[in-house]
């Protein structure tokens, strides 16, 4: 069956026909690590995650790259805030770890590579040099700008004309540029106080003097521009031509428009066959964003609602559709997740019962499983329609409940197939994490055993049997339990 995807560049839904189905190249624009991630960021992550999970499930070989922008004036603006450190690198390191923690909490499948801008400056400089040599870019005052009028298709992605575009970049750049819409590939020097303080919190003292990391280049000491970074990293870790480029709707212009221009000017090839843009998450009628202050961090949402409810919320609406965060939508997501989890648990419990083997096939249940699989696949092939995919699983949950409620004996194979559908479609594709009811008991038992071993170890230490105590500590650490002895006793991290 054919996979269909939307394409912002063509404005149409198209058949997905990769050059090599065993090596589908996907690039997702990641996060500028200047603050804790919020649910608006998570919507992009989760939708991109589900896309690549589905393609893998459907038999494609997928190579997925998601960048980390760790060089940016917004990061510099956070220097000295809340003990984050006094350098751009220190702030970026802090928030990069925060993003990693959030991704793990949301059960995102690992991308193949998470390239960081700071580790790809040589590749960025080489790409800029190619554009200068080809006549698509020019140096001015130690900076390098892309000449948008040299690229005939500029504006095609966003549907704009070059001469109607607003100026790109701060006022200080305008005098150096040949056209107001030209954009910076390389910026001379560090981040100016004006640029940094534009993004700095009002309660923080303003920065003075240039800040941020700089690198030597053929045009002098400076920093890469924002747009060139993604082109260089995509070309380095994927190819000059990729199959799918995913990003937030707010990146269509100027970021992705500029990516296309600089990438295709440098390589002479079509940069990406399909541009998929995830609609922004809204709250109270406005997009959720750090600048508006109307956001909910991923960590807080997961702590309050649980990772499965958050994921269910973010997949309950297709990526091309408007999505709202509110108490009502969170409540709906909670109910959907609980329905799926309860049906999965009831099916698993019924399978374990003696009566599971006593009843012949239940045609209604087995038909419901087959229908759910077919409807789920059809939904995902129709431009990753996660809303319809979730609905297919909810219909299966209803069928499972009808079967379990309607008899004292159960169709073992039918229930087994239902559990498998929940776990492969809801789990492997949508990223939900099902628990058959034994999980909490198993965790509790493991904690009790660990506590017992810690008690024995403390007794060995008290008795002076330090080698035995150290051996127990090492064996615990091999199981992921860190033990550190202090004057106040042992500190344990699990």
Swiss-Prot record:
Q: Which GO terms describe its molecular function?
A: ATP binding; cysteine-tRNA ligase activity; zinc ion binding
Q: Which reaction does it catalyse?
A: tRNA(Cys) + L-cysteine + ATP = L-cysteinyl-tRNA(Cys) + AMP + diphosphate
- Name the keywords, alphabetized: Aminoacyl-tRNA synthetase, ATP-binding, Cytoplasm, Ligase, Metal-binding, Nucleotide-binding, Protein biosynthesis, Zinc
Q: Which cofactor does it need?
A: Zn(2+)
Zinc found in the keyword field: yes
- GO CC annotation: what is one? cytoplasm
Gene field: cysS
Protein origin, superkingdom: Archaea
Q: What is its EC number?
A: 6.1.1.16
Q: Which SMART domains match?
A: DALR_2 (SM00840)
This protein's record includes keyword Ligase: yes
Which Pfam families does the UniProt record give? CysS_C (PF23493), DALR_2 (PF09190), tRNA-synt_1e (PF01406)
State how the cofactor is bound.
Binds 1 zinc ion per subunit.
What name appears for this protein in its UniProt entry?
Answer: Cysteine--tRNA ligase
Family per similarity comment:
Belongs to the class-I aminoacyl-tRNA synthetase family.
- 'HIGH' region (motif): residue ranges: 31-41
| Species of the source | Halobacterium salinarum (strain ATCC 700922 / JCM 11081 / NRC-1)
Which HAMAP family does the entry mention? Cys_tRNA_synth (MF_00041)
Localization annotation: Cytoplasm
* UniProt-listed SUPFAM superfamilies: Anticodon-binding domain of a subclass of class I aminoacyl-tRNA synthetases, Nucleotidylyl transferase
Return the InterPro entries for the record. Cys-tRNA-ligase (IPR015803), Cys-tRNA-synt_Ia_DALR (IPR015273), Cys-tRNA/MSH_ligase (IPR024909), CysS_C (IPR056411), Rossmann-like_a/b/a_fold (IPR014729), tRNA-synt_1_cat_dom (IPR032678), tRNAsynth_Ia_anticodon-bd (IPR009080)
Q: Where is the composition biased (Basic and acidic residues)?
A: 196-211
List the GO biological process terms.
cysteinyl-tRNA aminoacylation
Listed binding positions for Zn(2+) are 29, 230, 255, 259
Q: Where does the motif 'KMSKS' region lie? A: 287-291
Quick one: where's region Disordered?
Answer: 187-220
């Amino acid at each position: 069956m054919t996979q269909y995807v939307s394409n912002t560049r063509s404005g149409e839904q198209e058949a997905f026909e990769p050059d090599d189905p065993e090596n589908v190249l996907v690039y997702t624009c990641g996060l500028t690590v200047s603050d804790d991630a919020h649910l608006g960021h998570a919507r992009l992550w989760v939708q991109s995650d589900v896309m690549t999970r589905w393609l893998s499930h459907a038999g494609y070989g997928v190579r997925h790259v998601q960048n980390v922008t760790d060089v940016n004036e917004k990061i510099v603006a956070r220097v000295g805030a809340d003990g984050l450190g006094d350098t751009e690198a220190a702030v970026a390191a802090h928030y990069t770890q925060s993003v990693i923690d959030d991704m793990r909490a949301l059960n995102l499948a690992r991308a193949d590579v998470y390239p960081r801008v700071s580790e790809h400056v040589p590749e960025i400089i080489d790409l800029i040099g190619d554009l200068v040599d080809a006549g698509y870019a020019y140096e001015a005052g130690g900076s390098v700008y892309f000449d948008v009028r040299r690229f005939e298709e500029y504006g095609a992605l966003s549907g704009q004309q070059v001469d109607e575009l607003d100026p790109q970049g701060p006022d200080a750049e305008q005098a150096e540029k040949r056209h107001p819409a030209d954009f910076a590939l390389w910026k001379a020097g560090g981040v100016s106080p004006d640029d940094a303080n534009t993004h700095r919190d009002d309660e923080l003292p303003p920065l003075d003097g240039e800040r941020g990391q700089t690198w030597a280049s053929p045009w002098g000491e400076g920093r890469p521009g924002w747009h060139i970074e993604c082109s260089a990293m995509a070309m380095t870790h994927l190819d000059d031509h990729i199959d799918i480029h995913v990003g937030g709707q707010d990146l269509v212009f100027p970021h992705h428009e500029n990516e296309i221009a600089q990438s295709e000017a440098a390589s002479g090839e079509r940069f990406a066959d399909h541009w998929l843009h995830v609609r922004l998450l809204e709250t109270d009628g406005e997009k959720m964003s750090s600048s508006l202050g109307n956001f909910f961090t991923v960590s807080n949402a997961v702590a309050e609602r649980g990772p499965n409810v958050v994921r269910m919320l973010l997949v309950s609406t297709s990526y091309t559709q408007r999505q709202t965060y509110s108490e009502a939508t969170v409540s709906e997501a909670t109910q959907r997740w609980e329905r799926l989890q309860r049906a999965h648990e009831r099916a698993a419990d019924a399978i374990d019962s003696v009566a599971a083997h006593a009843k012949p096939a239940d045609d209604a249940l087995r038909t419901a499983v087959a229908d759910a699989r077919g409807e789920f696949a059809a939904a995902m092939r129709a431009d990753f329609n996660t809303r319809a995919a979730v609905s297919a699983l909810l219909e299966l949950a209803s069928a499972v409940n009808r079967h379990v409620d309607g008899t004292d004996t159960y169709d073992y194979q039918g229930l087994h197939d239902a559990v498998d559908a929940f776990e492969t479609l809801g789990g492997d594709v949508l990223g939900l994490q099902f628990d058959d009811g034994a999980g909490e008991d198993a965790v509790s038992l493991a904690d009790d055993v660990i506590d017992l071993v810690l008690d024995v170890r403390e007794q060995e230490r008290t008795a002076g049997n330090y080698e035995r105590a150290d051996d127990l500590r090492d064996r615990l650490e091999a199981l992921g339990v860190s033990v550190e002895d202090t004057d106040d006793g042992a500190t344990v991290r699990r």
